[in-house]
Amino acid sequence: MSSSMPLAAAARADGDYSPVCVCFSVQARAEPGVMPRVVELFAKRGLVPQRWHSTASGSVLAIDVQIDGLGRDLCDYIARCMRQIIGVETVLTSDTRRSG
């Protein structure tokens, strides 16, 4: 399987037709400009996450985003862009197959 193959296509290639969900976990300083800059990375690509959850606790902002059908290359690129946002401290990604 090529690393440039979209995750959804990879799921079909190995016989599993369940959708692939990419998850981003972002830890940042709790500053007003962080959330719009993170969501902009999806919006300017015409992507709408299936799930967005954020929690501010003191000076820490935690953001969890889930989006279906995002290719590995684009996922990695968006994660690199997130890491360049001022105030973002950590970005982790994972992908899973949704059942159903």
Question: What residue ranges belong to the model's regions?
Answer:
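Regulatory modules associated with amino-acid/nitrogen control
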Residues: 1-44, 50-60, 73-100
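A generic structural motif
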Residues: 59-68
